[in-house]
C-alpha cells in the first residue's frame, strides 16, 4: 500500500502542527476549516503561504493541518514549519531555498518559567530600603 500524502510536524512555542500534503489544487485546511477562516489576519495567512510562495508550489498541493496548543501566531508559524518540512520530503532540492529563508529551523524560544519569590520570570518585587 503506497501512502498518498507526505507528513511532517512543525513546532513553535507551545504550538504543534501535524501537516499532510496531498497532490491537489491548493486548498489549505487547518483543523477542518479553510486557513483563511482559521487565521483571519492577513499577516498570519502570509506566514502560512510563505514556504509555498518561495518554492513556487502554491496551488499544487492540498494541505491538511491539525494544529494544537499555543496561540494563533504560534500555530501559524508551526504550520509554516510543518509545510516546509513536508515540502522537502516531496522534493529534496527545495531544501536550499527553504533553509536560506530560515523556514527549516525550529525557533526554540519558549516562555521562561516564573520563579518563586518573584512576580514573573525576570521581574522582581519592588525593593524597599527602609
From Swiss-Prot:
<dbReference type="GO" id="GO:0003723">
    <property type="term" value="F:RNA binding"/>
</dbReference>
<keyword id="KW-0687">Ribonucleoprotein</keyword>
<protein>
    <recommendedName>
        <fullName>Small ribosomal subunit protein uS9</fullName>
    </recommendedName>
</protein>
<dbReference type="InterPro" id="IPR020574">
    <property type="entry name" value="Ribosomal_uS9_CS"/>
</dbReference>
<dbReference type="GO" id="GO:0003735">
    <property type="term" value="F:structural constituent of ribosome"/>
</dbReference>
<feature type="region of interest" description="Disordered">
    <location>
        <begin position="109"/>
        <end position="130"/>
    </location>
</feature>
<dbReference type="GO" id="GO:0015935">
    <property type="term" value="C:small ribosomal subunit"/>
</dbReference>
<keyword id="KW-0689">Ribosomal protein</keyword>
<dbReference type="GO" id="GO:0006412">
    <property type="term" value="P:translation"/>
</dbReference>
<dbReference type="InterPro" id="IPR023035">
    <property type="entry name" value="Ribosomal_uS9_bac/plastid"/>
</dbReference>
<comment type="similarity">
    <text>Belongs to the universal ribosomal protein uS9 family.</text>
</comment>
<dbReference type="InterPro" id="IPR014721">
    <property type="entry name" value="Ribsml_uS5_D2-typ_fold_subgr"/>
</dbReference>
<dbReference type="Pfam" id="PF00380">
    <property type="entry name" value="Ribosomal_S9"/>
</dbReference>
<dbReference type="InterPro" id="IPR000754">
    <property type="entry name" value="Ribosomal_uS9"/>
</dbReference>
<dbReference type="InterPro" id="IPR020568">
    <property type="entry name" value="Ribosomal_Su5_D2-typ_SF"/>
</dbReference>
<dbReference type="GO" id="GO:0005737">
    <property type="term" value="C:cytoplasm"/>
</dbReference>
Amino acid at each position: 500500500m503506497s501512502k498518498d500524502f507526505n507528513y511532517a510536524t512543525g513546532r513553535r512555542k507551545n504550538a504543534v502542527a501535524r501537516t499532510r500534503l496531498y497532490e491537489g489544487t491548493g486548498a489549505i485546511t487547518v483543523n477542518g476549516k479553510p486557513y483563511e477562516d482559521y487565521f483571519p489576519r492577513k499577516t498570519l495567512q502570509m506566514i502560512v503561504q510563505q514556504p509555498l510562495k518561495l518554492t513556487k508550489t502554491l496551488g499544487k498541493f492540498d494541505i491538511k493541518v491539525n494544529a494544537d496548543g499555543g496561540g494563533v501566531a504560534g500555530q501559524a508559524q508551526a504550520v509554516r514549519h510543518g509545510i516546509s518540512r513536508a515540502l522537502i520530503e516531496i522534493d529534496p532540492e527545495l531544501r536550499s531555498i527553504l533553509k536560506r529563508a530560515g523556514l527549516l529551523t525550529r525557533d526554540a524560544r519558549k516562555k521562561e518559567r516564573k520563579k518563586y519569590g518573584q512576580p514573573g520570570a525576570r521581574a522582581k518585587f519592588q525593593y524597599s530600603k527602609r
